[in-house]
A protein has these predicted regions:
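Domain-level signal for soluble alpha/beta catalytic cores
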Residues: 1-196
Length: 196
């Protein structure tokens, strides 16, 4: 008897992929070489999930170094940051073990994603034999890009939020159009807010 399951969240990144991210940040490898390491990790994640008999699988989010910043930058360290962003934004998570995560800071508009989840779905579809699930970031997380104090010159908070909602919708619709069976919205900041 099988138990219906589906993946939630990312899988740990293999050591080889972690090294590739670090080497890419340091300029030691090209984007193409990083993509090769991501492809290998995604294929491994998909095949292992399929081997468990899971009726739906994911790529383990191996193509991203952070659930919160995949639309904005190539790596967690900020390599390949999108237009109108600076790397010195607010911290959104301080974990119990002391490590933290920082978002970029919006410097102007219009706000646009650099990368959409559909790109990950399209690549994973070529590797999977089972239906795919794709995670996307919640707009509430990316709303934290706008500085808490003051306004971005020439780009109101209201216009940013409108652009953000449009981009989030485009992200979700694009993932479905690319063939994903399910889209989940990653709302990790909600869990972190409950720790108080």
């Amino acid at each position: 008897m099988s138990i219906p399951t589906e993946p939630v969240g990312s899988l740990p990144r293999p050591a080889k992929l972690q090294a590739a991210y670090a080497d890419y940040d340091a300029g030691k490898i090209t984007k193409e070489q990083l993509t090769q390491a991501q492809d290998a990790a995604c294929l491994d994640s998909i095949k292992r999930m399929e081997a468990t008999g899971s009726p739906i699988v994911s790529d383990g989010e191996q193509r991203i170094s952070s659930f919160a910043t995949y639309p904005l930058t190539d790596t967690l360290a900020g390599t390949g940051l999108a237009d109108h962003l600076a790397g010195d934004g607010q911290y959104f998570a301080i974990f119990t073990d002391g490590h933290n995560r920082q978002l970029p800071r919006l410097t102007g508009g219009p706000f646009r994603y650099k990368t959409y989840a559909a790109e990950f779905t399209e690549k994973a579809m070529k590797m999977a034999t089972k239906p795919l699930k794709q995670a996307v970031i919640a707009p509430s997380m990316l709303a934290l890009l706008y500085p808490l104090d003051g306004e971005v010159k020439g780009y109101s908070r209201e216009q940013f939020l409108s652009d953000l909602c449009d981009e989030c919708e485009k992200d979700i619709r694009g993932a479905f159009k690319a063939g994903t069976a399910r889209v989940s919205i990653d709302f990790t900041e909600g869990r972190l807010a409950c720790r108080c």
